[in-house]
Swiss-Prot record:
Active site, UniProt feature: 184 (proton donor)
GO MF assignments: 2-dehydropantoate 2-reductase activity; NADP binding
Organism: Streptococcus pyogenes serotype M18 (strain MGAS8232)
GO cellular component, one term: cytoplasm
Source lineage: Bacteria, Bacillati, Bacillota, Bacilli, Lactobacillales
Reactions performed catalytically: (R)-pantoate + NADP(+) = 2-dehydropantoate + NADPH + H(+)
Subcellular localization, as worded in the UniProt entry: Cytoplasm
Pfam families: ApbA, ApbA_C
Protein family: Belongs to the ketopantoate reductase family.
EC number from the UniProt entry: 1.1.1.169
Binding positions for substrate per the UniProt entry: 102, 188, 192, 255
Residues that bind NADP(+): 7-12, 102, 128, 268
Protein name listed in UniProt: 2-dehydropantoate 2-reductase
Length: 307
């Protein structure tokens, strides 16, 4: 199969690297010039659990011409419509598109470009880091769940899961992936924005009594909005999952902290807490915590003059 990685940041590099070890062809797509040039000139330098340099083709999305069998989306949420527009030329009648983006509502965007028959939605707990252009740091293990959005095309989902398992990516075909997507979004909604605004680690947030109160209110808002949309969510179970994750990730600054505080980049807030607030408004459900957090993050972006 010919697999394109649409958005070859840290996670895209992990998936591209691991899939390239199977008998499938991989092409990385990205718009970051320095990253593209580094990989073209020196290969992708992998550090962490393995130290290796691999030659992988990389190009801008608009330069890709060969029809894809599978496209894995790893772009930033706000760049998704542009990416789908840019890769229209490599999408054939049977091209499968797997979305592994953080956050909520991406399927609504993807449906505008791809028939439901070919859409796969997933969620992953793999992690990865970029040490600079063309340098990926891959450590630890992870897993992912995915599902075909078309109930009559489950075979496609199983086929993609098999391919990912050959790449040791620990994929599970999930008959009901949407609650898992919401659960991960809730983890991000309790940790990402809050740690970015408070400039603290996950452990520091959860050690604060007021921080914990806020976390529980955010979880409640995610759960009531998700349930109103027909998603099976158990507040007690999700709270436990968030607490467990906070212990494992106690020393980490989450990705939104990296974006907002460390690198002064736009955040994905509109697809996490912002999405819950927007959905809540449509459903007549008040979500004051998610609304305020979204406004604060946007205000911080404006204060820092991030565009």
């Amino acid at each position: 199969m010919l697999v394109y990685i649409a958005g070859s940041g840290a996670m895209g590099c992990r998936f591209g690297y691991q899939i390239s070890k199977t008998n499938n062809d991989v092409i990385l797509l990205d718009n970051w010039e320095d990253h593209i040039n580094a990989i073209k000139e020196n290969g992708l330098v992998v550090t962490g659990d393995v130290e290796e340099t691999v030659k992988l083709p990389i190009m801008k999305p608009t330069e890709a011409t060969q029809e894809a069998d599978l496209i894995i989306l790893f772009t930033k949420a706000m760049q998704l419509p542009q990416m789908l527009q840019d890769i229209k030329g490599i999408i054939g009648k049977e091209t499968k598109v797997l979305c592994l983006l953080n956050g909520l509502g991406h399927e609504d965007v993807i449906r505008q470009y791809i028939p439901e028959h070919n859409i796969l939605m997933g969620v992953t707990v793999w992690t990865a880091g970029l040490e600079g252009p063309g340098r990926a740091h891959l450590q630890g293990v992870g897993a992912l769940n995915l599902q075909s959005m078309d109930p009559n095309n489950q075979d496609a989902g199983h086929q993609v899961a098999d391919l990912l398992n050959k790449a040791n990516l620990n994929a599970t075909y999930d008959e009901n992936v949407v609650p898992n997507i919401w659960r991960k979004a809730c983890v991000n909604g309790t940790m990402n924005s809050t740690c970015a605004l408070l400039d603290c680690t996950i452990g520091e947030l959860f050690a604060s009594e007021d921080g914990l109160k806020m976390v529980k209110e955010i979880i409640h808002e995610f759960v009531i909005v998700g349930q109103a949309e027909g998603v099976e969510l158990n507040e007690e179970e999700i709270t436990q999952y968030v607490m467990d994750t906070s212990v494992k990730a106690a020393h980490h600054y989450p990705s939104m902290h990296q974006d907002l505080v460390q690198n002064h980049r736009l955040t994905e807030i509109d697809f996490i807490n912002g999405a819950v607030n927007t959905k809540g408004e449509k459903l007549g459900i008040n979500t004051p915590y998610c609304r305020m957090i979204t406004e604060l993050v946007h205000a911080k972006e404006a204060v820092l003059n991030i565009q």
